[in-house]
């Protein structure tokens, strides 16, 4: 690809980025239903959930378009850090999902519950503190390989350490790039086979 890479601008998440970021999540992880509108809602719901529990955001913008995001949560995972606006958004999206595709929605919710259970188990079996989490890292497939994910992850980790975290954790599925995380000083402390 001999194209010139445009400048990448990094800044905190803005509500106007929501649709573009949700679309990235949809392309990466939320494409199981034949109903595209449902997939869109599911991705948006996932994003709203991540935003509701995060204390830090960084978005990569290329040519005016949000192409990547990192979210993190520093400090105790108490209700103090929960963002009501995004919780309400998540709830509204869930009810739309339920109306549109009740079965797919039920499946998504049981997947989310299972994931939370698994993540909590993994956390208990690892020596990590329960707070200080990189809650989301997603980069548009079209810009993979440009180092955008590295900058975003480093920004999230820097935020956590500026809040006094000596360790941070993130959850990932098995088809992620382990090498990428290892290069950033992460190592697998626990795994779960679904």
Give the ranges of each region predicted by the language model.
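Conserved catalytic-core motifs of GNAT/GCN5-like acyltransferases
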Residues: 77, 169-171, 187-194
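Conserved GNAT acetyl-CoA-binding A-motif
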Residues: 131-132, 160-173
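A short beta-loop-alpha structural element at the N-terminal edge
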Residues: 7-23, 74-75
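Conserved beta-strand-loop-alpha-helix junction that forms the acyl-donor binding cleft
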Residues: 135-144, 169-179
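Conserved acyl-donor/pantetheine-binding loop and adjacent beta-alpha core of acyl/acetyltransferases
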Residues: 76-132, 194
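Active-site rim helix/loop that mediates acceptor-substrate recognition in acyltransferases
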Residues: 35-62, 67, 71, 92, ...
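Conserved acetyl-CoA-binding loop-helix of GNAT-fold acetyltransferases
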Residues: 139, 145-158, 183
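Conserved active-site alpha-helix within GNAT-family acetyltransferase domains
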Residues: 120, 150, 162, 174-191
């Amino acid at each position: 690809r001999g194209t010139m890479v445009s400048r990448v601008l990094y800044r905190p998440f803005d509500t106007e980025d929501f649709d573009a970021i949700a679309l990235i999540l949809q392309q990466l992880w939320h494409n199981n239903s034949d109903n595209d509108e449902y997939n869109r809602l599911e991705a948006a719901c996932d994003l709203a959930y991540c935003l509701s529990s995060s204390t830090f955001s960084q978005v990569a913008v290329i040519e005016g378009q949000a192409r990547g995001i990192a979210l993190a949560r520093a400090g105790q995972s108490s209700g103090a850090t929960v963002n009501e606006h995004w919780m309400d958004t998540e709830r509204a999206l869930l009810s739309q999902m339920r109306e549109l595709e009740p079965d797919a929605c039920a499946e998504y919710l049981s997947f989310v519950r299972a994931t939370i259970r698994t993540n909590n188990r993994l956390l208990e079996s690892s020596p990590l503190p329960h707070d200080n989490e990189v809650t989301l890292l997603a980069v548009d497939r079209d810009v993979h390989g440009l180092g955008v994910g590295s900058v975003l992850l480093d920004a999230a980790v820097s935020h956590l350490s500026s809040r006094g975290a000596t360790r941070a954790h993130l959850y990932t599925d098995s088809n992620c790039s382990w090498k990428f995380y290892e290069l950033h000083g992460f190592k697998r402390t626990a795994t779960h086979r679904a």
